Amino acid sequence: MSSAATALQGPQPNALPAASHLDRLEAESIHILREVAAEFDNPVMLYSVGKDSSVMLHLARKAFHPGTPPFPLLHVDTTWKFREMIAFRDRMAAESGMALRVHINQEGVARGIGPFSHGSAVHTDVMKTQALKQALDRYGFDAAFGGARRDEEASRAKERVYSFRDRHHRWDPKAQRPELWNVYNGRIHKGESIRVFPLSNWTELDIWLYIHREGIPVVPLYFAAERPVVERDGLLIMVDDDRLPLAPGEIPRLERVRFRTLGCYPLTGAIRSEARSVPEIIAEMLDSSSSERQGRAIDHDQSGSMERKKREGYF
């Protein structure tokens, strides 16, 4: 049995022991954050408001304490995020003292692009991938931090910490650079950029153990509560506002659910759960055999869809 599971079975479930591997992961991530800040002219941190972004923001604030991290936050708003995510984003950005850049693809808005009118693939491409590329070009960012981890998905498993992108923001796995002994090559030509993943070597369990140890706030959607949902294609979709079209006879019902991963609310499935605290989330996760991203509809558009999205410029 793992040390995490043993600790959670003790008489005080909130008293997890210090984990030395978390210290090593923290040190590695802080080193990467400082390296990028020193090496690049105009870095930015992509803040998607999820648990990984929350850990990455916490690490950035630690890395540059007592000062403010020397780069802004960037949030690509698809206009379909959970309302709780937007409120949490604004609160955490204000608390950090970092500038927050919010970018919406206005061309997509003008065309009426959405997950129901055009489908998840088109919506994701226009309102996330193309919007991200617009924002990077608009502000001239040459390095962008992201919270992706190698354990999440197959294409991310072969991602470098410094992920090279050409002048069109495209990712070519064959053009990536070796990173022997944690030495990173950030040399780029004008117009090229690097996506940087400080959490590459973390796992989902590491993220939650660190959130617990550090007391990092996360969006309440991660905790079980009664929420209005409808079941579609095996996914429990939360009815977050009145834009969700209901099928004839379809009636939202209250269920105790939470989210393991967060995205656009019509494309993100909840899971039935009783976990209302971080230790309970960790215990539930240790007993689960399902993938963290099982509830992300965009991952199931086609086989290998994540790698195609990355080649097109997706984070």
Swiss-Prot record:
Gene3D superfamilies: HUPs. Pathway: Sulfur metabolism; hydrogen sulfide biosynthesis; sulfite from sulfate: step 1/3. It catalyses: sulfate + ATP + H(+) = adenosine 5'-phosphosulfate + diphosphate. InterPro entries: PAPS_reduct_dom, Rossmann-like_a/b/a_fold, SO4_adenylTrfase_ssu, Sulfate_adenylyltrnsfr_sub2. Its EC number is 2.7.7.4. Keywords: ATP-binding, Nucleotide-binding, Nucleotidyltransferase, Transferase. GO terms for molecular function: ATP binding; sulfate adenylyltransferase (ATP) activity. The keyword Zinc-finger does not apply. Transmembrane segments: none annotated. GO terms for biological process: hydrogen sulfide biosynthetic process; sulfate assimilation. Residues 287-315 are annotated as: Disordered. Residues 293-315 have a biased composition (Basic and acidic residues). Pfam families: PAPS_reduct. Belongs to the PAPS reductase family. CysD subfamily. With CysN forms the ATP sulfurylase (ATPS) that catalyzes the adenylation of sulfate producing adenosine 5'-phosphosulfate (APS) and diphosphate, the first enzymatic step in sulfur assimilation pathway. APS synthesis involves the formation of a high-energy phosphoric-sulfuric acid anhydride bond driven by GTP hydrolysis by CysN coupled to ATP hydrolysis by CysD. PANTHER family: SULFATE ADENYLYLTRANSFERASE SUBUNIT 2. Heterodimer composed of CysD, the smaller subunit, and CysN. This is Sulfate adenylyltransferase subunit 2 1. It comes from Alkalilimnicola ehrlichii (strain ATCC BAA-1101 / DSM 17681 / MLHE-1).
